[in-house]
Amino acid sequence: LFDAAELAAKYLPAHGHGDALSFEWSVFGQRVVINPGVFEYDAGKFRDLSRSTKSHNTVTLDNYDQSEFWKSFRVGKRANIINCNNIIKNDSFTVTASHNGYTRLSKNPIHSRKISMYPDKIKIEDSIEKGNGQNAVARIMLSPDISVEMNDRNCFLLGKGFKILVESDNKISLKEAWCFLDFGHR
């Protein structure tokens, strides 16, 4: 599942989240990469966290959200998808998309993501065009049912009946995060 759609309906952005170019992934019916869900609709830290870009499987620049979230149900400047393309071949599928949510930052950075799927691997490539050297952080939220083994550059995701190698050109770190699989439960 890949989110390359508008933030929300233009007339009702209240339920929009900072999830442009985010993805979810299941293996053999088991959720691996998840959307962490929503805890509450009332104003507060968990509402803000649920909507934030850092709580989704995408990239933050200098820890900014892709869109400007105000209070519990308002949105200011919004990230918009500015292109989305896909290529289907016999044994692979590739989707590429970009958004303009960070153009309010210095030198108008554009985040692009390319996800390529093959029979034996998935490759995710993020790039930042323009910009002013902002610190880019890609986050991936794992299901609580997934175990992790890791070293500096690689990690293994362990589920029921599978073990997946994750490789990166950058350092991988593991941090705990909030997950709201059911509304109102943490």
Predicted feature residues:
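Carbohydrate-active enzyme catalytic cores, enriched for enzymes
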Residues: L1-I34, I88-K89
